[in-house]
Amino acid sequence: MSRESLFREAFTVVLEPVTPVHVWGGREAVIGIDALVHGNELILINFEETLKKAPEDVLRRFTTLLRSARPEEATASFLKELKSRELISGLRIPIKTKSRIEPNSRVRILHEYIIPGSELKGYIRTGIIKGLLKEIPNANKIIADGIDLEKEAKNVGLGIEALLLRSPRPRKQGGFVDALSIISVSDPLAYEQVERSLRELRVVHTSRLDHVASLLAITFSRGRLKYEVTIRRIEKPRLTSRPHERNVIEEVENTLEKINNLANKIGSKNWLLNTLRKFGCDLIKIELNKIKGTTKLRNYEDLLSRLEKDLCSENTSCVPARIGFMTGHESKTIIPEIKNYDPRIYDEVKTRMQQELSRFWDALTLKLVEVDEDLFGVGWCKICVE
């Protein structure tokens, strides 16, 4: 066995959407400016290619308009004329919403990697932290010590992660070592039969399904993404020291031991798979409890029940997951986990976040997307370890 294989474990992870998934790439398109509706398709305009196709008379009129009208008005007129001549170049996305798409509507653009490795690693990280909390006897103390209500709302639980995962660097270096830095997740290495679609993502009240908010987004609706997940083990160096350096050496050794203990645990595919399975299946249970008996969501309830039946037994190499935008606190943070250990602290965090974010508490809403005239939760997918 090579030296490298002793300290490195790598395996392939395949991700498939079960319902449309959206990971925002940070860009928006505006209908009539850099995107057009053409029949049942959205065209994300490639201006470089479109300008190459544009006839000289149209370009002259566009240039004249730019001198006398606002740029967005001139652009809209220019594109309208090119559209009528079928001269628009760009990525064409099927429109899968019945909602009217008005001029100047904004569309959130899917990330260029669809679901980047950083998004998948963030989900895995949250699952591991929840798994570790379930295994340690002093979880209540870690939660009590780790919550900081003085921090920005989204960061109130970072202290819990620090207590579980961080070790101080040797005193002269300062700072901390995050034990989960041993995990790396590549961006997708293969894209298989990928389908994108434009859909309306909705936030509704859990009890009445009343509208709270909505937006248009390009989603990943079908296909397979392949990633490489790598777990590194750090070789414990042979350290010799003078007596006055012994404390520093012990700090280094303790830090490496903590990191490698975690690496040994995570490096077991069974442990990682079972941890992510528990995480995903808990998410299914939480959502089923929210929607149980809601007539309009019966097909969604059936879908989750099938996922639970197919993927929540320990003899499968695939697990359910919920990833991306509008998937709720449960899938992105450890805050909902606090309720299981200390309801009082959970209520304090809930109150703090509601005050700062000025919106309905996450657990009181559902995030839905229309698929073939039915409503389903956004972001459900299947993760398989090969």
Where do the language-model regions lie?
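Basic, Gly/Ser/Thr-rich N-terminal segments that form RNA-phosphate-binding interfaces in CRISPR RAMP
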Residues: M1-E386
